[in-house]
């Protein structure tokens, strides 16, 4: 009950400050996934397993915050944006952490990576680094949206927001390119079908991180135009 009152006070001050707190945990989740990926590429399964567990724990925290925020937003709260818009954005932002957790689960499936070529591992690592960028940009975007609101929708602050949104879209496009390159390598290589399926699912869940980041950026664009 005490925590719910805290969230309500934050929502009363600004509808975006609680979302910023949730975004912080989302970023931590993806950052931890990158550490898991580094250990995975080195063949350090036990260390990777530790980081994968932390990813799962952080995703649980993000889910808990999401539930608390959802329960705290009531129709009685006076906010400059619709309750449904806040909830839709929160849902999309939370999906970023979900995608990170899905990736971590796939990493755990295979212990020995001797059959996975280094060029494939390198692309997966690049996708991981770009995913971090996407998550951090989402965090910057929701913080900037708060600045836009506090400035009374000043043109200078709006331009900053659109710049961040464009950066998110660019990162998502870059990851799509890496994903396509990876698929080409997998289908032209002599990988065992199980290894191919394993790699493609890691790539798919990694791509979902940037896809969900782009979705949140689009939601921010909608909020800006309302």
UniProtKB/Swiss-Prot annotation:
Segments crossing the lipid bilayer: none
InterPro entries: DUF47, PhoU-like_sf, Put_Phosphate_transp_reg
SUPFAM superfamilies given in the database record: PhoU-like
Family from the record: Belongs to the UPF0111 family.
Protein name per its UniProtKB record: UPF0111 protein PH0637
Native organism: Pyrococcus horikoshii (strain ATCC 700860 / DSM 12428 / JCM 9974 / NBRC 100139 / OT-3)
């Amino acid at each position: 009950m005490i925590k719910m009152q805290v969230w309500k006070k934050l929502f009363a001050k600004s509808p975006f400050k609680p979302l910023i707190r949730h975004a912080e945990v989302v970023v931590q989740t993806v950052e931890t996934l990158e550490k898991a990926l580094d250990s995975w590429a080195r063949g350090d399964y036990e260390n990777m397993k530790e980081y994968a567990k932390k990813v799962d724990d952080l995703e649980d925290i993000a889910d808990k915050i999401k539930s608390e925020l959802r329960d705290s937003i009531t129709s009685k709260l006076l906010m400059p944006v619709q309750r449904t818009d806040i909830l839709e954005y929160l849902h999309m932002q939370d999906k970023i952490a979900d995608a990170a957790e899905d990736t971590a689960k796939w990493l755990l499936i295979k212990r020995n990576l001797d059959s996975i070529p280094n060029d494939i591992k390198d692309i997966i690592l690049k996708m991981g680094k770009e995913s971090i960028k996407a998550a951090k940009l989402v965090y910057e975007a929701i913080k900037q949206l708060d600045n836009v609101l506090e400035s009374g929708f000043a043109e200078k602050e709006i331009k900053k927001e659109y710049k961040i949104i464009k950066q998110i879209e660019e990162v998502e496009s870059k990851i799509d390119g890496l994903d396509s390159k990876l698929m080409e390598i997998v289908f032209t290589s002599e990988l065992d079908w199980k290894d191919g399926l394993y790699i493609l699912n890691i790539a798919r869940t990694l791509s979902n991180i940037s896809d969900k980041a782009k979705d949140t950026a689009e939601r921010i664009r909608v909020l800006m135009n309302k």
